[in-house]
Amino acid sequence: MAHPSQLGLQDAASPVMEELLHFHDHALMIVFLISTLVFYIILAMMTTKMTDKYILDAQEIEIVWTLLPAIVLILVALPSLRILYLIDEVENPHLTIKAMGHQWYWSYEYTDYEELSFDSYMTPLQDLNPGQFRLLETDHRMVIPMESLIRVLISAEDVLHSWAVPALGVKMDAVPGRLNQITFMISRPGLYYGQCSEICGANHSFMPIVLEAIPLDPFEDWSSSMLEEAX
C-alpha cells in the first residue's frame, strides 16, 4: 500500500512485481554509473587544461563510444524482455475473471462460476468507515484466492480505460471491442488498491480497483454465498 511522501515503489505482492523491482534497481544502477561518468568528464574538462581541442581522428575513442552504448542497451534489454515474456505466459489459470470498464465504474464476471458477477463503484466519502481510504474504496471488492494463477480478461463498454494494480505489477488497457488479458498470482493475503490509468472522462479519478486476496477455502465460501444471493 502506498503512503504519503513515498518515493519508492510499492511493496511487491506478486512474483512479477518482485522481478520488476529487481529490474528497476538494475536499470537505476546503470543510469547512476552513466551519470557519474558524464559528470566526471564535464568536471574534468572544466577544471583541467590537459585536454586536446584539436583531435581530428581517434579510432580507439570511436570504437569505445560505439561499443559501450551497445553493451548498455543489451544489459537493459535482456532482463526487460525476460519480464515481458514472463508476463505474457499463460498456462492453465486456476480462475478467469472478466473485468469490464464503464464510465465510471468496473464490472466483474467470474466466468468459472455461473451467474457470479457484480458492479464495483467507488464508495462515497460520507459512507467511508474509519481507516478506509478516500477515492480508493469500492462497494464490492474483487475477491480472489491467493497463491493461485489468476487470468483477467479486460475490455471496455464505452471509451478507453486501463486496469492497473501497482502492487501486483499489472496494467492493461481496456479497449472497446477488444479483449486483452493479463495473468498474475498474489503471494500473500490482503487488500490491494489500483485505479483506472487511462483518462476516460470527467470522473476518471473515481474508478478505483480493490482486490481482496484470501485463502482458497474462504474464497469458496465467499463464492457460494454470492451465488446464493444471486439466486
From Swiss-Prot:
Component of the cytochrome c oxidase, the last enzyme in the mitochondrial electron transport chain which drives oxidative phosphorylation. The respiratory chain contains 3 multisubunit complexes succinate dehydrogenase (complex II, CII), ubiquinol-cytochrome c oxidoreductase (cytochrome b-c1 complex, complex III, CIII) and cytochrome c oxidase (complex IV, CIV), that cooperate to transfer electrons derived from NADH and succinate to molecular oxygen, creating an electrochemical gradient over the inner membrane that drives transmembrane transport and the ATP synthase. This is Cytochrome c oxidase subunit 2. One of its GO terms (cellular component) is respiratory chain complex IV. It comes from the Eukaryota. The chain crosses the membrane at residues 15-45, 60-87. One of its GO terms (molecular function) is cytochrome-c oxidase activity. It is a multi-pass membrane protein. Pfam families: COX2 (PF00116), COX2_TM (PF02790). Its cofactor is Cu cation. It is found in: Mitochondrion inner membrane. The keyword Translocase applies. Keywords: Copper, Electron transport, Magnesium, Membrane, Metal-binding, Mitochondrion, Mitochondrion inner membrane, Respiratory chain, Translocase, Transmembrane, Transmembrane helix, Transport. Residues 1-14, 88-231 are mitochondrial intermembrane. It catalyses: 4 Fe(II)-[cytochrome c] + O2 + 8 H(+)(in) = 4 Fe(III)-[cytochrome c] + 2 H2O + 4 H(+)(out). Residues 46-59 are mitochondrial matrix. It comes from Latimeria chalumnae (Coelacanth). The lineage of its organism: Eukaryota, Metazoa, Chordata, Craniata, Vertebrata. Gene3D superfamilies: 1.10.287.90, Cupredoxins - blue copper proteins. Its main location: mitochondrion.
